[in-house]
């Protein structure tokens, strides 16, 4: 899969370089540089065609819209991944806390129900396959 991206990256680097060179030609345009300008424009068109061909190999790749927003804001798109992982970790810790709280609640509930309804709770534990009441 990496070779698909390598191929695209190579074409994008060539395209960006041609755009940079075109900018230089245009910024100091002289009638004598018309041939160079036309050549660069042809290279850019060819580069866009090459990039379009890469699109077919990458049709199954999806990029979250937020990544493009990061790029538009001048931020590093890898920060998006970092922030997603941090949010997932925080959510995971929050859910773990809820699970631990529910386990403690269940244990306390069973203890209290065992005090009030010892026979019923003994039946419950036998159905559940528990030999002794939880402490």
UniProtKB/Swiss-Prot annotation:
Annotated compartments: Nucleus
GO terms for cellular component: core mediator complex; mediator complex; nucleoplasm; nucleus; ubiquitin ligase complex
UniProt KW keywords: Activator, Nucleus, Transcription, Transcription regulation
Main location: nucleus
GO process annotations (BP): positive regulation of transcription by RNA polymerase II; positive regulation of transcription elongation by RNA polymerase II; positive regulation of transcription initiation by RNA polymerase II; protein ubiquitination; RNA polymerase II preinitiation complex assembly; somatic stem cell population maintenance
GO terms assigned for molecular function: transcription coregulator activity; ubiquitin protein ligase activity
Domain of life according to the entry: Eukaryota
InterPro entries in UniProt: Mediator_Med10
Subunit and interaction comment: Component of the Mediator complex, which is composed of MED1, MED4, MED6, MED7, MED8, MED9, MED10, MED11, MED12, MED13, MED13L, MED14, MED15, MED16, MED17, MED18, MED19, MED20, MED21, MED22, MED23, MED24, MED25, MED26, MED27, MED29, MED30, MED31, CCNC, CDK8 and CDC2L6/CDK11. The MED12, MED13, CCNC and CDK8 subunits form a distinct module termed the CDK8 module. Mediator containing the CDK8 module is less active than Mediator lacking this module in supporting transcriptional activation.
Family: Belongs to the Mediator complex subunit 10 family.
Described purpose of this protein according to its UniProt entry: Component of the Mediator complex, a coactivator involved in the regulated transcription of nearly all RNA polymerase II-dependent genes. Mediator functions as a bridge to convey information from gene-specific regulatory proteins to the basal RNA polymerase II transcription machinery. Mediator is recruited to promoters by direct interactions with regulatory proteins and serves as a scaffold for the assembly of a functional preinitiation complex with RNA polymerase II and the general transcription factors.
Name listed for the protein in its UniProt record: Mediator of RNA polymerase II transcription subunit 10
Originating organism: Mus musculus
Lineage: Eukaryota, Metazoa, Chordata, Craniata, Vertebrata
């Amino acid at each position: 899969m990496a070779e698909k991206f390598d191929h695209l990256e190579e074409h994008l680097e060539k395209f960006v370089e041609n755009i940079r060179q075109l900018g230089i030609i245009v910024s100091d345009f002289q009638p004598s540089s018309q041939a160079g300008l036309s050549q660069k424009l042809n290279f850019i068109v060819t580069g866009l065609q090459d990039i379009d061909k890469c699109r077919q190999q990458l049709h199954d790749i999806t990029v979250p819209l937020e990544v493009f927003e990061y790029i538009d804001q001048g931020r590093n798109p890898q920060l998006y991944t970092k922030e997603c992982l941090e949010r997932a970790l925080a959510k995971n810790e929050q859910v773990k806390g809820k699970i631990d709280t529910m386990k403690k609640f269940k244990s306390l509930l069973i203890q209290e129900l065992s005090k009030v309804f010892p026979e019923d709770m003994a039946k419950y534990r036998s159905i559940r396959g528990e030999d002794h009441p939880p402490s």
